[in-house]
Amino acid sequence: MKAIIGKKVGMSQIFDENGKVIPVTVIEAGPCTVVQKKTSDKEGYEAVQLGYEDIPERKLSKPEMGHLNKAGVAPKKYLREFNLDNAAELNVGDIVKADTFKEGDFVDVTGTSKGHGYQGVIKRWGAQRTPTSHGGGPVHRHAGSMGSTTDPSRIFKGKIGAGQMGVDQVTIQNLDIVKVDADLNLIAVRGAVPGPKGGLVLIKSTVKTHRVKHADSGISNNPQ
């Protein structure tokens, strides 16, 4: 498994050798610094902690700075842990760049969806409006009946309702990498990824076998 931290730059399009337009999301991937290395002997599993994006020291707490100073790493805004196949080969202070992936790799991209604030059931869950005529009632954007009265005298869990919409962790699986620019630390993946421009994303090797989504392609039983 390979992984890297990045930021969503935006969407664009690339033409393949047949002139077909491929919608892609451009991600600024890395460079990331190995901040901590976890081993089976000490922690019970193999993993590395990556740090991404330099920030001023004054923006971190003393415990955070102590953790980074112990590793001899400059202040980082984001720290994330990954279970990597080559964790034993990496050492604290090593740099992970976009070229850890190559064109044709399949990845899972995790991000935070856009926030939409407090929304009603129609926008949040796609509920149907009540009739606007023929006795449709005084309100037309409510959820309608939520269940019985005396029995069970409560609303079952899972019923839709108004509330905060968005700002959820979302993972899009089996996106293939169309292009990698190692000099600019940019990765272009086919399709859309969660979050706004500038949003933090985690790119990891896909964990599932899959069927390639686009046309004129075969089936991959072991993508990595």
Description of each model-found segment:
Residues 1-224:
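Extended basic (Lys/Arg/His-rich) segments that typically form rRNA-contacting surfaces
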